[in-house]
Amino acid sequence: MMQLYWVALKSIWAKEIHRFMRIWGQTLVPPVITMTLYFIIFGNLIGSRIGEMHGFSYMQFIVPGLIMMAVITNSYADVASSFFSAKFQRNIEELLVAPVPTHVIIAGFVGGGVARGLCVGILVTAISLFFVPFQVHSWVFVALTLILTAILFSLAGLLNAVFAKTFDDISLIPTFVLTPLTYLGGVFYSLTLLPPFWQGLSHLNPIVYMISGFRYGFLGIHDVPLVTTFGVLVIFIAAFYLLCWSLIQRGRGLRS
């Protein structure tokens, strides 16, 4: 039985990866172009006037945050669009009636989202080499933060797709929630520059912890304790996973 589940998981993974690789011009190229513009405008043009941040050039400071921004956006978008398309076309019903556990279905779609997020992250990192020298303080923290964040936002995208009723619904969360939280997550500034009240308020933003942990992996500096960073990631992943499992298990919004 486990072999059957493994075959099902690999099949979903392969389908999801083939889906975004087949249209790479729409899924991989646009975020790379967008991040390149960020590097040029914020890093080169504005960064040269700002000066150093925690002993690093402004460009070096924002690179980890921009990479994380690309991973968050693309992990989320991949699963949200893919799962909702399967639901809209009623392909998901074939999975629901097949002898495949809900855990395998979730892992398959999330695996596709993580793969796209990591692909975009690697491409953006490669582009950043044209602007700043490559520096890594801890590969372990870079890999852990990147993978856990990609998993979290893939689950968030899945959750959005389960509740969505139209294609417009899957763009509401990225526009009105994800984008503001990302911009206010410390990508372009350090929390230490904020007044005490706004520092405290910023700690309610989960993206702050992810960017801080990822920046530590690259530069060795962080705004929040590392234990807290991984604690927040694990708690959110567990909560989102259980919620997704419960909704799909009950067929919420999936069965006609």
Regions found by a protein language model. Give the residues of each.
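Aromatic- and glycine-rich beta-strand/loop motifs that create alpha-glucan
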Residues: 1-32
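Hydrophobic alpha-helical transmembrane segments of multi-pass membrane transport/permease proteins
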Residues: 22-48, 61-73, 179, 232-239
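Membrane-interfacial helix-loop-helix junctions in multi-pass membrane proteins
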Residues: 20, 182-239
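Short alpha-helical transmembrane interface motifs in multi-pass membrane proteins
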Residues: 26, 61-65, 72-77, 107-109, ...
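Short cytosolic juxtamembrane segments of multi-pass membrane proteins
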Residues: 248-256
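Alpha-helical transmembrane segments and their short interhelical loops
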Residues: 102-174, 221-245
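Hydrophobic alpha-helical transmembrane segments of multi-pass membrane transport proteins
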Residues: 33-38, 58-128, 157, 175-176, ...
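Pore- or pathway-lining transmembrane helices of multi-pass membrane proteins that form conduits
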Residues: 29-33, 166-185
